[in-house]
C-alpha cells in the first residue's frame, strides 16, 4: 500500500483528492501547506492540491514547499498545486487569458506515465483564473485544452507532474486513472 501526503492549500477539493486515493486502495493524509514538511520517510509520494491562493501574488506564502522537491519522490500538482510546482521550477504563472470553469476537453499531447490510458482526449473539470503561461525549462507540456496551452506538465528534474484540471471530481472522465497512474509511479 502506498502512503500519499496531500498538501492542502485550503481548497474545497483537497478532501476529494484524499478520498480518490483511498478509493483505489491506498493511504492518504492531509497536511496544511503552511506547516513544515513531515519526516520524508513517512510517505511514498506527495500531491499539491488546489486552493484559493493566487499565483504569483501569493508565491511568498508557498516558497517553503520547495523542501518537498528535495525528497525526489513522485509529486503531482493539481490546479493551484500545478501552478506552485511550475513556479518552484522557474516557470511563469499569471492570469488566464480565457479562464476555464466547468467541463473542458483536454487533448493529450504525450501519453506519458500520468496520462496513460487517457489519449487522445478526455473531458475534465476546470476551475481556474490563473494558469502556467510559460513552462519551466526542465519540463514538457503533455496536454492542452482549447483555451489553456499548459494543461499538464512532465518534469525532467524529478518524478514530478502537474495538471491544471481536477482529476478528483466525478465530472472528470477517468479521473481515477490519473491517481492510479500516479500511485504506480510511487511504487517504483
Swiss-Prot record:
Keywords: ATP-binding, Glutamine amidotransferase, GMP biosynthesis, Ligase, Nucleotide-binding, Purine biosynthesis. Pathway: Purine metabolism; GMP biosynthesis; GMP from XMP (L-Gln route): step 1/1. The active site is at residues 79, 166, 168. It catalyses: XMP + L-glutamine + ATP + H2O = GMP + L-glutamate + AMP + diphosphate + 2 H(+). The keyword ATP-binding applies. Residues 3-188 form the Glutamine amidotransferase type-1 domain. Gene3D superfamilies: 3.40.50.880. The keyword Ligase applies. One of its GO terms (cellular component) is cytosol. Its EC number is 6.3.5.2. One of its GO terms (molecular function) is ATP binding. PROSITE patterns: GATASE_TYPE_1 (PS51273). It holds the Pfam family GATase. Disulfide bonds: none annotated. Heterodimer composed of a glutamine amidotransferase subunit (A) and a GMP-binding subunit (B). Catalyzes the synthesis of GMP from XMP. PANTHER family: GMP SYNTHASE [GLUTAMINE-HYDROLYZING] (PTHR11922:SF2), GMP SYNTHASE-RELATED (PTHR11922). This is GMP synthase [glutamine-hydrolyzing] subunit A. It comes from Ignicoccus hospitalis (strain KIN4/I / DSM 18386 / JCM 14125). The lineage of its organism: Archaea, Thermoproteota, Thermoprotei, Desulfurococcales, Desulfurococcaceae. The gene is guaAA.
